[in-house]
Amino acid sequence: MNQIDTGLVKRLIGEQFPEWAHLEVKPVKFSGHDNRTFHLGDKMSVRLPSDAAYAPQVEKENKWLPILRKELSLPISTPIAKGNPSEAYPWPWSINKWIEGETVTKQNVRDLSEFAAHLGSFLVELQSIDASKGPIAGAHNFYRGGLISVYDEEARDAIENNKDVFDETVLKHLWDLALQSTWNRKQVWVHGDVAPGNLLVKDGKLCAVIDFGILGVGDPACDAAMSWTFFDKSSRKIFKEVLQIDEETWNRARGWALWKALITYDANRDRKSTRLNSSHNVASRMPSSA
């Protein structure tokens, strides 16, 4: 496969959507891991899966996002057109409406507690939408909304590999707590990757939620993992209150955050990087975080 760059995007647009071939194509400032994203003019974006594992996300987003967006008060990713596999690129791809906003950071949020409340309210809205026909959590969304126990071996290996860095006993206890319960209520919609890179702010306030590639239905615990990766103690409390999360679900949410921090640290331990530092901070703070 050719490298995913502006040249490839221009070729695909020219071949499949010639009416937009005159528009400028340029990479977005922050592109994710699962997809490579490019501006298409001022009002659209092009998203191309970076690997075959992420290709099914295109069909899923095109099917469900137009339905979900009607029930949500905040803008979300909006598919405009779907590109087909071709000689130049082997998987389906999408053209979406461009949403104005900045990727959220601690520096551009007006008030962290306000942001936590607004994000919590959005997730409550998402969870209230009928999910009876939605895609059940599984391999297609890396089990977000499914049983966290699918990552048990991976998490325990990471704890063992890094017991010289973290408190092994405490982390094993937190992980065990996450495995002690399951979601036994009605399955709900989960975004699957509620993280700063997928949240936009304008004038310091949450203005949009994007990248629903690992959307699914199941246990909402995974969508609360940001409690430990972004919020401080007071904003974390507000987030929990707005979501009305019981303690067992809270333990599973913490488990999702712990698993991701541990495997990220384990994979990057031998090289200095922002990912190494941030994952270390999350795993180190977790024992003292309610």
Spans of model-derived segments:
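Juxta-kinase regulatory segment immediately upstream of eukaryotic protein kinase catalytic domains
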Residues: M1-E19
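ATP-binding pocket architecture of kinase catalytic cores
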Residues: N2, W20-E153, D157-T169, T182-N184
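Short, surface-exposed alpha-helical segments at coil->helix boundaries
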Residues: T6-K10, N62, K233-K237
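Generic recognition of well-ordered alpha-helical segments
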Residues: R11, E15, K63, I67, ...
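Active-site Asp-x-Gly
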Residues: A55, Q187-V190, A195-G255
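ATP/Mg2+ or Mg2+-diphosphate-binding catalytic cores
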Residues: A55, R156-N161, K237-I245, I263-R275
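Hydrophobic alpha-helical segments that form the core
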Residues: R254-I263
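Single conserved hydrophobic/aromatic residue that forms the stacking wall/gate
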Residues: L276-A290
